[in-house]
Amino acid sequence: MRVFHVKHFDVVVIGGGHAGCEAAAAAARMGVQVALFTLRKSGLGVMSCNPAIGGLGKGHLVREIDALDGIMGRAADEAGIQFRLLNRKKGPAVQGPRAQADRRLYREAVQRLLAAQPGLTVIEGEVVDLQVNGGRVQGVSLADGTSVWAGRVILTSGTFLNGIIHIGDQRRPGGRMGDDPSQRLAAVLGELSLARGRLKTGTPPRLDGRTIRWTELEMQPGDEDPVVFSFLNRAPKARQIACGITHTNARTHQIVRDNLSRSAMYGGHIEGVGPRYCPSIEDKIVRFADKEAHQVFLEPEGLDDDTVYPNGISTSLPAEVQEAYVRTIAGLEDVRILQPGYAIEYDYFDPRELRPTLEVKALGGLYFAGQINGTTGYEEAAAQGLAAGLNAALSIREREPLHFSRSGSYLGVMIDDLTSRGVTEPYRMFTSRAEFRLSLRADNADQRLTPIGLDLGCVSDARRESFNRKRELLEKGRALLEGSSFTPSQLNELGIQVSQDGMRRTAFAVMAFGEEAASAVARGVEGYGDLPEEIRQQLAKDGLYAQFILRQEEEAAALKRDEAIRIPADFDYAPLSGLSSELKSKLMRARPSTIAQAAQLEGMTPSALTLILARLRRAGRDAAAV
């Protein structure tokens, strides 16, 4: 980070959250001069809400960011104090790495990575206006009257645009607790005539870990064989800890129920829509009234920090009500609240106003990334920041833009969802959103995206060398597997039961029979067992899904062909048990007349379309039989 001494840059990034840090680093890796504006340098990389990175779908995004040499995965590996691979018992395609992080270590890691990045200048100051000329952005103006010129501007405002913090019936302006909102810039953006709306998110009260009865709680350790995020790392760097698990109860629920009218959300003080898949404790008790208890994870916020994050009870109830209901929870009877939970409401813009590069259609040179586009979550924000930063730098260099495809990355799925379908509620990533998820595994993100990074020039020499070594080993292993074949009798001798059909099967094809088959192949193919475990694991996953991926591609093509099929106006979605309640309500409200229209609904998934098609075809057959 250098002292601010120039007033012209190639790219200006506004905001130092997860999207802004990733955008600034990505653009600078492309060799352009970047200025990152933030209200406080000490706030760069702050984890404003939960102290965790990754998860289902989200962990895939972190791996993709890392594959393009982004910073989130490396910072999470440095700061991670508990690593868990979610969905470990399910197929590799939907397994998601997650790490609970030490807030201080994560923030310091991000700041250190930014400081080491050539071409990146971090500047403290509030951007209050955009310099525009001839329908293109030309730079920004600061609150102190300074003008800074730049050919491209990336806005990553998070929850700061007209942000309002709510605790019960109390409300005050704020971008997050302790920070002022961005109101002047919000007014300037309002003059662009872009479609905009209000969203909200929330956070739970922070607890004093010294007042928790830890000995009375169930403890959850991390994985014994932790899976880290960066392809450059092999193991966590920080000391690992366990988290506590407790539950709400009938007393908790009654206190919340009795005070619903005092909640900012249920008291009518908030107009913004909250995240469906991260509901407040008020939402849980209203929407899931039949549930007797809700799980709460007690996550220490750091190795040297007594603050505990109670994951699962975010709220906008008054502070005294929060204290009352929290103390009904087992293990928290004497707990002290260090900071009350709160809801925050903020402006966002319809992402359909953006090109797939995340450039604003109505104003050339201006890019949006993160929560300003209607997403929720650190990982979704960081991934958008990466895409915006790379594309802004490519544009400055007058090179072809980078378009991430749905078939090649979760990043491509997210950007396509946002720019083609828009959002009416905070968007978060799930593996179910990707029609090609069998080939978009977390473990092969480098094989999918690092070659793109090499072509762009955004990947370090160290990563290039590491990637090339891994690719050579994968090619060697694949050749060994494809070059070896077995008769049914030989496979039976190895402990793999197949029909005696006389067909020889390559060792790669045998991988489709699962883990035991992969172990047997390691014994039966000369030289294969000498390959590193990581390489053999990835090849086993490639083989496991090979046939399914072909079927996946055929199903995606079939869906494309079936887009013209009509859906009756009175079609009943309620009996489709495979549809989420979210999609049922959206389908019944929108009443799409064709499969193509249904496909454009926000939150629609390929599996949901397949269910609708199957029901339509069954109805057609039944009608023909009458």
From Swiss-Prot:
Q: Any idea what job this protein has?
A: NAD-binding protein involved in the addition of a carboxymethylaminomethyl (cmnm) group at the wobble position (U34) of certain tRNAs, forming tRNA-cmnm(5)s(2)U34.
Question: What is the protein's quaternary organization?
Answer: Homodimer. Heterotetramer of two MnmE and two MnmG subunits.
Name this protein carries in UniProt: tRNA uridine 5-carboxymethylaminomethyl modification enzyme MnmG
A GO term for molecular function: flavin adenine dinucleotide binding
Where is NAD(+) bound in this sequence?
274-288
Family as reported in the entry's similarity comment: Belongs to the MnmG family.
Gene name, please?
mnmG
Q: Which GO terms describe its cellular component?
A: cytosol
